[in-house]
Amino acid sequence: MSYSKNNMLFKNVLNFKKNIPSHVAIIMDGNGKWARKRGKSRFFGHFSGFYAARRAISFALFHKLKILTLYAFSSDNWNRSPREIKVLMELFFYALSNETNNLNKYNIRLKVIGNKEKFNTVLKNKIRVVEKETLKNTGLLLNIAANYSGRWEILEAIKKIVVAIKCKNLSLNAITESTVSDFLLINEKIPVDLVIRTGGECRLSNFLVWQISYSELYFTNTLWPDFDRKEFKKAIDEFSNRERRFGRVSH
């Protein structure tokens, strides 16, 4: 199934304003609650969440977003049951294995951000292969945050900066906010415009701590498997209606 399928159904319904975000980041929350409401296992919820992610990618393509960042697996999620973690890793591998053709077909570049060393060898190799196969794609950049935390990302950036100083490739006095951004996995050349969190919780869960200083935040009670194109449209409409001041006085 292609990402574009059924998107044309929304062509005459969607009526966006000009203020469209370039970079949208989504905290995909609510798979377990969604499954529980239906008397299903959490695993069923995660698999349904995978299809919600495909819809989000389709929406991003159709509306020409430049970057879509999906928070798939927090470093704190290792505290879940071994069985659930096993299912999540298998689902991740399944998605990578089955979506590569679509990624290339629609000119999508995949980038997995996070500490990949904790993944098993098979999954690490699959990530490496898919990233390489989509590296030259110039359309949507799809970031998948897996085994990721914002604090970890900043810590890794600090370590790299220290090494650069020791190697005399960087001067301590030359370090600016822009320098730090350059060492992050997601830099601010295209800043995060909008952060969406599904599932009814109003927190950021250690996601993109550095990058979202000026991002607009949108929280919805909609559970992730139910987050369809209409729900995505609501978030974009809300973003379009907001005045982004960046510290300036309101007009």
Swiss-Prot record:
GO molecular function, one term: magnesium ion binding
Keyword Transferase carried by entry: yes
SUPFAM superfamilies for the chain: Undecaprenyl diphosphate synthase
Top-level taxon of the source organism: Bacteria
Swiss-Prot/TrEMBL keywords: Cell shape, Cell wall biogenesis/degradation, Magnesium, Metal-binding, Peptidoglycan synthesis, Transferase
Any one Gene Ontology cellular component term annotated for this protein: cytosol
Database matches in PANTHER family: DEHYDRODOLICHYL DIPHOSPHATE SYNTHASE 2, DEHYDRODOLICHYL DIPHOSPHATE SYNTHASE FAMILY MEMBER
HAMAP family, per the entry: ISPT
Protein name as catalogued: Ditrans,polycis-undecaprenyl-diphosphate synthase ((2E,6E)-farnesyl-diphosphate specific)
Lineage: Bacteria, Pseudomonadati, Pseudomonadota, Gammaproteobacteria, Enterobacterales
